[in-house]
Amino acid sequence: MDAPRGIRPLWRVPGIVLRERAHPPGRVRVPEPMVMDDPESVAHFHEGGLQNPGMQAVYDFGARAVDALLPLNGRLLDLGVGSGRALSAIVRRRPDLKVTAVDLAPNMLATAQRLFEEEGIDGQIELVKADITALPDALADGEWDGVSCMWTLHQLPEVEVLRGALRQIAAVRRKNDAAVWISDFQRLRDPSATEAMLQCVDPLSPLILRKDAMASESAAFTIDELAAELAAAGLEGMSRGHARPLPYLQAFWAPGARSPRSPIATSSPLRGAARREAMLLSLGFSAKPF
């Protein structure tokens, strides 16, 4: 039976969680194209980040994490900036940071540039068209206090490509003793879980955004898969956490030599439904750096 329009049928969540836990492992990953650059897809993805409280909460979560890991006036290398929403949340929270952000998709980079100019933060961010699996020497040899990779790894088509990206992150950390923040979707056991959960928690979200989220979850690596590849790349011993009760989001992090003892920013710009969603996400995450 369908819930009335606008009502979130949260009473269905326990059943979704139980089915996920009972489902046997072994679900096959369904890769996505490495570069999302179709103008219509980029536009829908970008606008969804502005209008959707759940996505705003996810971006705020990443901003709070990076805030806890980066020192005052720190330098951040962001791999896979996309349309810029996640990085915007970081820089608006921490206007002291200087960031170089990398992506391969021209339309994503152009969208991010417009966003940063509209928000008046473009002076703090340098955008570079580059492959995160083979960084230019100017970036690989740069001095960084932290390196972030947010909502990007699921776009990598093959495990060998993932390994290339993780080797770049490991090299930056090794050279600089830099902090690391990695966040992404996790592929669940039950292939129906993500769609069912979205119908519960975000029933009014546009269909194109829900389809994108389901495709991203299907393409994502599991926590165990990603943990093993991180260790193999030289990033062993990282802290990790995941969303609860359904572990559809995951994060790995490590402090750097100059990481602060506590977060530098103290307030959140979110209001209303987005602030509520951010609180629920933060409280539900199994572990986090803040």
Where are these regions (language model features)?
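A short, conserved alpha-helix within the catalytic core of class I
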Residues: 156-168
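Conserved beta-strand signature within the Rossmann-like core of class I S-adenosyl-L-methionine
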Residues: 176-184
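Conserved class I S-adenosyl-L-methionine
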Residues: 2-71
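A conserved beta-strand element that flanks and buttresses the S-adenosyl-L-methionine
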Residues: 148
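Class I SAM-dependent methyltransferase SAM/SAH-binding core
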Residues: 77, 83-134
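C-terminal alpha-helical "lid/dimerization" subdomain adjacent to the S-adenosyl-L-methionine
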Residues: 183-230
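Rossmann-like AdoMet/SAM-dependent catalytic core
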Residues: 237-252, 256-290
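Short conserved loop adjoining the S-adenosyl-L-methionine
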Residues: 134-141
